[in-house]
């Protein structure tokens, strides 16, 4: 499916519909990121981030809107959700190239997981099947198909502890405000196993083990039990990441996603 980046006209139509009394609405810039489709805009002196679901999902933007409504008011607040467009308040701060130290990251995730649940469960198998079906046929390997069949037969691990998850924790989704960290981009959020969140964070193996130790202490979970549960989720999270890169390559034609996918496959094959 050809990828079509949202145009300024589409954005202006959304703003006119959502903010009819606005005296001025100007597109400041298209925000960088692998997902595309995000714009920083100013409406009557209020800075917002507007994002359109370019894949025309009927559920994703409303879910993100509801997720942000349930989260603490210190996070980005949802303003409008119309026809696949979502506008949230802009969080000022710095985006850094690396994740925070393990104690800070563990505290951030534990605090999130203490919040009330969203009300909808994360189901990985439909996402894995979608990525396979919407990827380039030439990129569908026997290894991918075998792993997909194996996970489908096994089924998802039984949750160790259910909580609201972000599911996309990486440096680009963390805003640093002095001594405070804020998560942004909640489009993949939902309720799931806390061990799944730890398996999905973009970390090397050594740092992930340190995070497991830190989190187990905070959450009063047996460290060995948590480590084993994260290990059960690792093939799922690895395939989710590799499949996402493959699908994004098919949508955009950007070979950056091939490089990222190849590295994700390498990691899956060496585990």
Where are these regions (language model features)?
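A conserved alpha-helical element in kinase catalytic cores
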Residues: 46-87, 91-114
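A glycine-centered beta->alpha junction motif in the catalytic cores
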Residues: 84-98, 114, 127-137, 239-254
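Active-site Asp-x-Gly
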Residues: 177-227
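Active-site acidic catalytic loop and adjacent metal/ATP-binding pocket
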Residues: 35-43, 50, 152-198
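A general structural signal marking secondary-structure boundaries and capping sites
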Residues: 72-75, 109-117, 155, 219, ...
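Helix-rich C-terminal or lid/interface subdomains of diverse kinases
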Residues: 215-271
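ATP-binding glycine-rich phosphate-binding loop
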Residues: 21-43
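An alpha-helical support segment within catalytic cores of ATP-dependent transferases
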Residues: 7-22, 117-167, 177
């Amino acid at each position: 499916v050809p990828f079509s980046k949202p145009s300024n006209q589409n954005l202006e139509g959304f703003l006119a519909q959502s903010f009819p009394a606005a005296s001025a609405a100007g597109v400041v810039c298209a925000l960088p990121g692998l997902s595309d489709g995000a714009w920083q805009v100013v409406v009557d002196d209020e800075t917002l981030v507007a994002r359109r679901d370019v894949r025309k999902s009927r559920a994703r933007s409303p879910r993100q809107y509801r997720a942000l409504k349930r989260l603490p008011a210190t996070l980005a607040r949802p303003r409008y959700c119309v026809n696949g467009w979502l506008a949230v308040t802009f969080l000022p701060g710095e985006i850094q190239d690396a994740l925070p130290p393990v104690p800070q990251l563990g505290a951030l995730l534990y605090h999130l997981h203490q919040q009330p649940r969203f009300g909808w469960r994360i189901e990985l198998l439909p996402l894995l099947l979608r990525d396979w079906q919407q990827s380039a046929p030439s990129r569908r390997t026997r290894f991918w198909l075998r792993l997909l069949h194996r996970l489908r037969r096994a089924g998802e691990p039984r949750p160790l502890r259910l909580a609201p998850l972000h599911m996309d924790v990486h440096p680009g989704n963390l805003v640093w405000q002095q001594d405070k960290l804020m998560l942004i981009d909640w489009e993949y959020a939902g309720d799931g196993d806390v061990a799944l969140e730890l398996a999905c964070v973009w970390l090397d193996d050594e740092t992930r083990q340190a995070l497991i130790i830190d989190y187990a202490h905070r959450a009063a979970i047996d460290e060995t039990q948590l480590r084993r549960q994260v290990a059960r989720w690792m093939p799922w999270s690895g395939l989710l990441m590799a499949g996402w890169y493959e699908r994004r390559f098919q949508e955009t034609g950007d070979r950056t996603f091939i490089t990222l996918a190849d590295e994700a496959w390498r990691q899956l094959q060496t585990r």
